[in-house]
Amino acid sequence: MSETMIHVEVVYALPQKQRLIGLDVPDGTSMLDAAKLSGIGEQFADLDLDKAPMGVFGKVVANPAGHILKPGERVEIYRPLTADPKLNRKRRAKEKASAGKASN
């Protein structure tokens, strides 16, 4: 008797390079295992799948090794923030204030 397979997608994106890989995995496969089976870790030198945060359709999953995928789910591998969001907001507010003063 053959294993039941499900179709899932694994995605990862950098500003200059993005990958979406569709693959069939055995029913009962974890999010982490699907990411490893996709081979995406070999396409991005700095990507450590064991440590990378992951989610499904925009929702972070705390334990990718324990999340069993459902048919059609998309595993999203997130990269770390390159800038502090608070500092970015402050910078934008300061620029907006400066632009307002310049127009007066």
UniProtKB/Swiss-Prot annotation:
Family to which this protein belongs: Belongs to the UPF0125 (RnfH) family.
Domain of life: Bacteria
Protein name: Protein RnfH
Region (Disordered): 80-104
One Pfam family of this chain: Ub-RnfH
Organism classification: Bacteria, Pseudomonadati, Pseudomonadota, Gammaproteobacteria, Oceanospirillales
Annotated NCBIfam families: PRK01777.1
Originating species: Alcanivorax borkumensis (strain ATCC 700651 / DSM 11573 / NCIMB 13689 / SK2)
